[in-house]
Curated annotation (Swiss-Prot):
Family: Belongs to the UPF0304 family.
InterPro entries: UPF0304_YfbU, YfbU_alpha-helical_sf, YfbU_helix-hairpin_sf
Species: Yersinia pestis
SUPFAM superfamilies: YfbU-like
Residue ranges the record marks as coiled coil: none
Protein name: UPF0304 protein YPO2563/y1624/YP_2374
Length: 164
C-alpha cells in the first residue's frame, strides 16, 4: 500500500481515535497505528486486506451459506423424529478469522449491521469458527441446493448436508 506522509498521518490519527472509541480492539488499532506511522512495508500489506474488495458472487455465496443454515434450523425444528441429529451440528459456526477473515467480516456485517440472521448464535468468538470452513460449506451447499424442498428437509437430508 503506497501512501504519502500526509495520508499516513491521517490514517494514524484515525487508528488513534479508534483505540478510544473501541477499547475492546484497542491493541489491534495501536499496532496498526504503529505500522502506518513507521511505514513498515511488510506489515502495510496487511492493511491492504482491510481495504480489499469482495465480489458480488462471493457475497451471494455467503448469504446462501447462511440461508442454508437457517433452512437446516427450521427443518430440524419441524422434525417429529430427530433421530441421532445433534442440534449443535446444524449451527452456523462462521468462518476462520486467521484464514477467512474477509468472509467472517461479511458475516458480522450481515448480522450486526444489516440485521439479518440475528437468530444465529455468534458464540463467544463472534462467528470465528477457528478452523477453515469455506470448502466444507461449499460441499454442504451443493447437497442442499439439490434438495427439492430446501426448507422442509428430512432427517436423512439434514444428515447428508451436515456430513458433506
Amino acid at each position: 500500500m503506497d501512501m504519502t506522509n500526509a495520508q499516513r498521518l491521517i490514517l494514524s490519527n484515525q487508528y488513534k481515535m479508534m483505540t478510544m472509541l473501541d477499547p475492546e480492539n484497542a491493541e489491534r488499532y495501536r499496532r496498526q497505528q504503529t505500522i502506518v506511522e513507521r511505514g513498515f512495508g511488510l506489515q502495510m500489506r496487511e492493511l491492504d486486506r482491510d481495504f480489499g474488495e469482495m465480489s458480488e458472487d462471493t457475497c451471494r455465496t455467503i448469504i446462501n451459506i447462511m440461508e442454508m443454515h437457517h433452512a437446516l434450523q427450521v427443518s430440524w425444528g419441524n422434525l417429529k423424529e430427530k433421530q441421532d441429529l445433534d442440534e449443535r451440528r446444524i449451527s452456523f459456526l462462521g468462518f476462520d478469522a486467521a484464514t477467512e477473515s474477509r468472509y467472517l467480516s461479511y458475516v458480522r456485517f450481515m448480522v450486526n449491521t444489516e440485521g439479518r440472521y440475528t437468530h444465529f448464535d455468534s458464540g463467544t468468538h463472534g462467528f470465528n469458527s477457528q478452523t477453515p470452513m469455506w470448502d466444507k460449506y461449499q460441499r454442504m451447499l451443493a447437497i442442499w441446493q439439490s434438495c427439492p424442498r430446501q426448507y422442509h428437509l428430512s432427517a436423512v437430508e439434514i444428515s447428508q448436508i451436515i456430513n458433506a
